[in-house]
Amino acid sequence: MRIILLGAPGAGKGTQAQFIMEKYGIPQISTGDMLRAAVKSGSELGKQAKDIMDAGKLVTDELVIALVKERIAQEDCHNGFLLDGFPRTIPQADAMKEAGINVDYVLEFDVPDELIVDRIVGRRVHAPSGRVYHVKFNPPKVEGKDDVTGEELTTRKDDQEETVRKRLVEYHQMTAPLIGYYSKEAEAGNTKYAKVDGTKPVAEVRADLEKILG
């Protein structure tokens, strides 16, 4: 099962990604993690990425696609994968298609901007595992502590209101057009597209996802 998650930052993708990974036994592929791992491994692609990043430039779509292809060929992607944060633009989606990376489901998490601002400003994370909590909507069992390890939770610098609003503007300009792109792909029978009401409580969104993914 190959899945792409779409939705603005704070639409609930991270929380549901954890659920999808555990339920369906597929890894989450984040381009940031993938780039860091490639640089660390010292592979040919990793060296190219390091040179570009060291020069303060953005890694090209071609290089990211090559890394995605390399990553999804690994054993743990045998049953599929979950792509989060990629593709971000229509040229990236086109490049994926040209590279023969097919996707079974595109899930759009739909949440109004104001609710997103509320959600992000109250967000707390367990940095080592990536587990995400919220003081109001998804609190940990013990305030300020991770449920699994009991370690301290922190607030990301990115979770300040001004930063959040800037990211939402960027999302609407750059990534939102992918919604139309993948709707058309679904009409052509190339993928399945589903809109998920991300305003619902976590458990209800989870139940909706189970219905969609089976």
Curated annotation (Swiss-Prot):
GO molecular function: adenylate kinase activity; ATP binding
Reactions catalysed, as given in the entry: AMP + ATP = 2 ADP
Residue(s) carrying N6-acetyllysine: K192
GO CC terms, sorted: cytoplasm
Gene Ontology biological process: AMP salvage
Entry-linked CDD domains: ADK
Enzyme Commission no: 2.7.4.3
Subcellular location: Cytoplasm
Pathway: Purine metabolism; AMP biosynthesis via salvage pathway; AMP from ADP: step 1/1
Cross-referenced Pfam families: ADK, ADK_lid
UniProtKB keywords: Acetylation, ATP-binding, Cytoplasm, Kinase, Nucleotide biosynthesis, Nucleotide-binding, Transferase
Gene3D superfamilies according to UniProt: P-loop containing nucleotide triphosphate hydrolases
Subunit structure: Monomer.
Domain notes: Consists of three domains, a large central CORE domain and two small peripheral domains, NMPbind and LID, which undergo movements during catalysis. The LID domain closes over the site of phosphoryl transfer upon ATP binding. Assembling and dissambling the active center during each catalytic cycle provides an effective means to prevent ATP hydrolysis.
Name of the protein: Adenylate kinase
